[in-house]
Amino acid sequence: MHSGKRPLSPESMAGNREEKKELCCCSTLSESDVSDFVSELTGQPIPSSIDDQSSSLTLQEKSNSRQRNYRGVRQRPWGKWAAEIRDPNKAARVWLGTFDTAEEAALAYDKAAFEFRGHKAKLNFPEHIRVNPTQLYPSPATSHDRIIVTPPSPPPPIAPDILLDQYGHFQSRSSDSSANLSMNMLSSSSSSLNHQGLRPNLEDGENVKNISIHKRRK
């Protein structure tokens, strides 16, 4: 007795195999291929994933930062960034130099502007002034802050024993020098007396000898 199901023909069995192969191929497709396939069928683009959106936002932010116009900064044809500022006292432009990035040139302009106008200056990065105004911007030539000069530290105190020893050495040296001085004075005085003729004269001695001989003859 037959169950009522008709046996499949070879053609139908081959068709089922082809359908299974197509399903396997579809399952192995990547998400991007599926999205492209669906967009082609529907005619509407499918929104990209969150990662693609974040990457596109970062690229857009970078392009916006590159296109930002900083005060006192302009780009050279060869790619460098030049910074300059107008001196309010001389009504002339002051050249600040060329820099690799626009941000470095903008910081150089901010520094010069702060030196010229103080807190009234219009800056590219005013938040840097609020964070640390004394370290980043004022230069020593234009800063009005008071300069505190610390006096030199006093020498360490000397112990009384060391003072007494030093005083004793000083006294011994002074006594030796005074003794040497007195000896020199005595030697010089004796030599001067000898030169002045205080020694017995040889001629006087000869005269005395002659007188004594004459008296004996008488």
UniProtKB/Swiss-Prot annotation:
Annotated disulfide bonds: none
DNA-binding region(s) from the entry: 69-126
Keywords from the UniProt entry: Activator, DNA-binding, Ethylene signaling pathway, Nucleus, Transcription, Transcription regulation
SMART domains attached to this UniProt entry: AP2
Sample GO molecular function, one term: DNA-binding transcription factor activity
Low complexity compositional bias, start-end: 44-56, 174-194
GO cellular component: nucleus
Region (Disordered), start-end ranges: 1-20, 41-72, 174-218
Highest taxon of the lineage: Eukaryota
GO-annotated biological processes: ethylene-activated signaling pathway
Pfam families in UniProt: AP2
Subcellular location per the Swiss-Prot or TrEMBL entry: Nucleus
Family matches, as InterPro entries: AP2/ERF_dom (IPR001471), AP2/ERF_dom_sf (IPR036955), DNA-bd_dom_sf (IPR016177), ERF_plant (IPR044808)
Functional note: Probably acts as a transcriptional activator. Binds to the GCC-box pathogenesis-related promoter element. May be involved in the regulation of gene expression by stress factors and by components of stress signal transduction pathways.
Similarity comment: Belongs to the AP2/ERF transcription factor family. ERF subfamily.
Record-given protein name: Ethylene-responsive transcription factor ERF112
Gene name of the record: ERF112
